[in-house]
């Protein structure tokens, strides 16, 4: 199955870069992408209010993947209309602080279309200041998002795309909260359910298992899942998707990025999602 045409594409992200919100949210997008890319550790990225602090915009260690080189990665981000001007400014600032040759990899990332990004990076690599220099523009990000569907759904929701068939568990919770006359905190749904909460987390840590919840109504079960993950494991919460249509289920089950898939329709193909030849998702 191909990519979902309703999810954010390169043009959507380029337009989003014009918004004030993107300045603080783009680093969060990068943090989520890195967190869901296998072989990436030591992630430290400032987002939202933290972007004004000095130092690198982000750091991480990579074992190497389809989208990242192997090594110590040092990130600079820019949502500016002129990505090359921002990249030059950031590169020059960092290069001045290098004594000898750095063993770090300089990575500039922009949600803009940057036609000359590859040639810019090649020229900078030839200077030999850093171990390597990379430049990622919106088209590289689009491909990366397609391989990390939980992040793809999240950013699509953030920029207002009318996604269907699935949504992040966090988005589902926010919709429920807005529709309630009385605001109920997430922890309300785990009150008196300590053993059940621990049991759910245990099941989600095992390969090839299906977590079955029984509740008086579907929303209660989903709210319980959200509250447990919110309290126990943000990383798992960011991978959790509520799937409402069989087509979306099949699409997500075929993806290589590990997900927590929560079906809210009848007779989902559980075996497809648990297929270890691709990626054993959690259900």
Predicted feature locations:
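Active-site signature of alpha/beta-hydrolase-fold catalytic machinery across serine-
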Residues: 227
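Conserved P-loop NTPase "ATPase switch" module shared by AAA+ and STAND
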Residues: 215-220, 230-283
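Mixed-charge (Asp/Glu-Lys/Arg
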Residues: 1-218, 255, 280-281
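Hydrophobic positions on the alpha1 helix immediately C-terminal to the Walker A/P-loop
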Residues: 223-224
């Amino acid at each position: 199955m191909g990519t979902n045409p309703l999810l954010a594409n390169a043009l959507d992200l380029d337009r989003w870069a014009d918004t004030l919100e993107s300045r603080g949210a783009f680093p969060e997008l990068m943090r989520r992408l890195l967190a869901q890319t296998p072989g990436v550790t030591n992630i430290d990225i400032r987002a939202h209010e933290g972007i004004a602090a000095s130092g690198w915009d982000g750091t991480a260690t990579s074992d190497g993947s389809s989208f990242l080189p192997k090594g110590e990665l040092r990130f600079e981000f820019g949502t500016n209309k002129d990505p090359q001007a921002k990249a030059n400014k950031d590169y020059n600032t960092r290069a001045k602080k290098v004594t000898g040759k750095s063993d770090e990899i300089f990575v500039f990332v922009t949600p803009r279309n940057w036609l000359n990004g590859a040639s810019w990076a090649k020229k900078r690599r030839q200077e030999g200041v850093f171990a390597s220099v990379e430049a990622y523009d919106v088209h590289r990000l689009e491909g990366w998002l397609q391989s990390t569907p939980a992040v793809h759904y999240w950013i699509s929701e953030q920029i207002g795309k009318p996604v269907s068939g699935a949504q992040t568990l966090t988005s589902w919770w926010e919709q429920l909260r807005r529709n309630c006359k009385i605001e109920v905190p997430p922890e309300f749904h785990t009150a008196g359910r300590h053993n059940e909460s621990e049991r759910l987390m245990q099941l989600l840590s095992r390969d090839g298992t299906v977590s079955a919840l029984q509740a008086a109504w579907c929303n209660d079960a989903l709210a319980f899942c959200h509250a447990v993950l919110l309290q126990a494991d943000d990383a798992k919460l960011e991978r959790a998707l509520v799937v409402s249509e069989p087509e979306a289920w099949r699409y997500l089950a075929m993806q290589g990025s590990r997900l927590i898939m929560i079906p809210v329709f009848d007779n989902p193909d559980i075996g497809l999602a648990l297929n270890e030849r691709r990626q054993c998702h959690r259900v």
